[in-house]
A protein has these predicted regions:
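Active-site helix of classical SDR
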Residues: 112, 147
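The beta1-alpha1 cofactor-binding region of Rossmann-like NAD(H)/NADP(H)-dependent oxidoreductases
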Residues: 52-62, 94
Length: 275
């Protein structure tokens, strides 16, 4: 699919993966409409930009109506926005948990429903950004992992419901060094250290996905046909399929990795700082 003159709506467009992907979509000639609760981190000439909180259902509906009125039918919707929260086992369904489900699942669901007639008319595409945490089990990320796994299920239902009319792709980013991981870093759960394998100060292997590579992968998800589930990078795809087909092995590996990092003093998890 060529992007020239395609109309693309992308959420979470102010920072990180969303902003870098929007920049590359623009570079390939797409009309790019951003949605985020923050102003863009760096200058980018969006064709339209809607400053709103995805938890505000009324404003989200108004933005969708405004986009359709101004641009007509859209070609691609990228549900990229996400929020990572951390919970202990005894944490109830608090405001942070509700916000995680709203941003990661319910807002994309709502936005997709508002754009669906337009997308069907254009035989368009929905790209839902899930996470490897939807497949790789880790402690303290119950709301994030559950909502992202539900996002994958929502994609599968849409794909089955509109065969030949709507292309639905789910992507599973691994660790990308962006601000979404700040809450985990603050309580000592460093995903960056978890995915970096060192001998002394020398990095032998890193499973980190560089922002440039990951955004290239998200652009490919917007343009390539016949995709269903994919990682954003080669290593990401390997991790995705390994987690899907060998879950017990991956669980054992993550548990061992957490124990070794803690024993070496490289991981200082502070559960008492988690609400």
């Amino acid at each position: 699919v060529k992007l020239l003159n395609k109309i693309v709506v992308i959420t979470g467009a102010a920072r990180g993966l969303g902003l870098e992907t929007a920049r590359k979509l623009k570079r390939q000639g797409a009309t790019v409409i951003g949605i985020d609760r923050l102003e863009p981190h760096t200058a980018l000439n969006f064709d339209a930009y809607y400053l709103l909180d995805l938890c505000d259902r009324e404003r989200l509906d108004e933005a969708a109506a405004s986009i359709l009125e101004r641009f007509g039918d859209i070609d691609i919707l990228v549900n990229n926005a996400g929020v990572l929260t951390l919970e202990r086992g005894e944490t109830g369904v608090n405001d942070d948990v509700r916000r995680a489900f709203e941003v990661n699942l319910l807002a994309p669901w709502q936005l997709t429903s508002r754009f669906l007639p337009a997308l069907l008319r254009k035989r368009g595409k929905v790209v839902n950004v899930s996470s490897l945490f939807a497949l790789v089990n880790a402690p303290y990320v119950a709301a994030y992992a559950t909502s992202k796994r539900a996002m994958s299920a929502y994609s599968d239902v849409l794909r089955m419901q509109y065969p030949g009319q709507l292309d639905v792709v789910t992507v599973f980013p691994g660790f990308i060094d962006t601000a979404i991981h700040d809450p985990a870093e603050r309580v000592g759960l460093s995903v960056k250290r978890l995915v970096s394998f060192k001998r002394g100060e020398r990095v032998l292997l890193s499973l980190e996905e560089k922002l440039d590579d990951a955004s290239n992968g998200l652009v490919r998800a917007c343009t390539q046909q016949g995709l269903r589930n994919r990682g954003l990078t080669f290593l990401g795809s390997v991790a995705m399929y390994t987690a899907r087909w060998l879950p017990s092995l991956v669980d054992a590996f993550i548990s061992l990795r957490l124990r070794r990092l803690s024993k070496a003093g490289q991981l200082s998890l502070k559960p008492e700082l988690i609400d």
